[in-house]
Amino acid sequence: PLRRQRQMCIRDRYQIEWARRGFVVFSFDLYGHGDSEILNNTEWLVNGRGLYDTVKYAATLPFVDKDQIAVSGQSRGGNTIHETILLDNKAKKQLIKAVLYVSRDAVYKDNETQSFGYVPGKTTSAQAASKNNGEYFNYYGNRNVGIIAGKFDQYSFKETDKTTGKMLPNPDYLKHNNAKSFLNFGITPDSSTADGVSGKYYTKKVDGKEAFRVIYLENGFHTSQLFQSSSTAAAMEFMVKAFNVNTSLQSGDQIYQWRMIGSTIGFIGMFMFAVFFALWLSQMPLFRGTSRGNAIMRVAESHPGTKAWAWGCLIVNTLFATVSTLFLYYNGVDTHIGTFFRQGQALFAGSMLAISSVFTAIVTYIWYRCFAKKNGMNIDEIDLKTSAFSVFKTIMLALTVTGGTLLLVWGAQYFFKTNFSFLYWGIMPFGSFKIVDMLKVLPIFLIGYVISSIFINCMNYNTSYGKNKIVNILVLALVTAAVPALVSGAGWAKFMLTGVNDLFGAAYTRIPDSMFLTVFLLFITPLTARGIYSKTRNPYLGGIINAILAMVITCVNCQVVFPA
């Protein structure tokens, strides 16, 4: 199981490598996540959001050793482990023998179970935290337990200095009391307790069985632990040691990087296919009128104030986009779960671009009325005007292109098990129940991406931002992705320098990571829009195609509804 913004396939690096070493690997989407059903509020946490159901199912299979079952989860997937261990501890026969957390704290103190222990129909918060005194304890008994932690994890492995009240640096996690208690099976650390050592196995006999604890402190951040070869090697080493598996494969013997290269080529190829498919169809009689021939890059005329207006507008737009984006964060749009909008991250990604694009349109109109028009710019010469019938045919063409692209991708996935993904981003088949949620945010994505395409192509296909076509579009693509890149970069810079992720406030540690998630799509979509515009002089076609593809990619990778 994984965190709230991912499908199970993002963790396939671990899955593939474990399977190569002889493990039977079960991967699933948590309830309300990925392709799993949305449950009602009384069923959310039943059986660890699906993890304990999976464990019990695995124990019924003849090819699974019932005495060698382990669970592993990344980020919020670790929460499911917390809940599942709570249930397994209460079971007549415990099924789980080993636990590996990735980018998630273990349970250190007995009162921490209150935050996740409410399982409707099974336990109450009071029962879950019956030892509600905040003392360190051994939650895992004689199971083998490990943690893969990133030195710069944005969310986990945080501890407050009891003397100063300040956050302790994340890279010093092995010096924290939480880590020292965990490695020593729940003791209450004091000044004599040695700091932890990364990769060292701490052993102890518990209830007559020798168990171990281990923490792998890796370079990297919260989600990078899913892609780093060193973290994968640690995960292999843990499971092999936990169950004394005889394998000739070393922990560093991995093949996933080749799969990642192939899936990245496929993901980029999907956008390329959409561009060339659109260009080909635009020449067909059915869609005649959606293309007006090749666009010619205009030479920006030099008038007094030209550069000042151009760069001034750019700076104003960037500043507004930065402020409006942070405003959305501080008002919890990215975590919003309501009765109408049920995907906060999708709502945020669409709103962020739509709001800044509308503001850009207003600034551009002011620029046109106050400067460009007075200096001879003719609105009829920049491909902005169109007809209702042309818009209709453009919409039909965009739907045909995106529909064909998705069918091609899904067909390749179904017949050849091809993966179209790149790190965080990917596209895969989805359940029909997601279509309604997609349609809710589609208008927001359309506003953002269509206006962005108009700005990039109609207004700026000239030498103002670069003397040739390649430089021009690269500059504009970088500008489009600049706000999330700068905000994320500022947060990361503070984090890397101090070890504390608090630039935007202790309650908003997610900002550097979440902002980074939007950079790739905001950079690549101007390239696809320009590729289509340069051969059709139709700014709306690329904008609509980008909006639909970006919306699908965002929605299929986000939770629908999920508890805390």
Predicted regions and their residues:
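Single conserved hydrophobic/aromatic residue that forms the stacking wall/gate
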Residues: 1-6, 10
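Alpha/beta-hydrolase active-site loop
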Residues: 41-62
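Alpha-helical transmembrane segments of integral membrane proteins
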Residues: 311-564
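Short beta-strand/loop motif that positions the catalytic acidic residue
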Residues: 147-149
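Alpha/beta-hydrolase fold nucleophile elbow
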Residues: 63-75
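Short glycine-enriched nucleophile-adjacent loop
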Residues: 78-91, 99
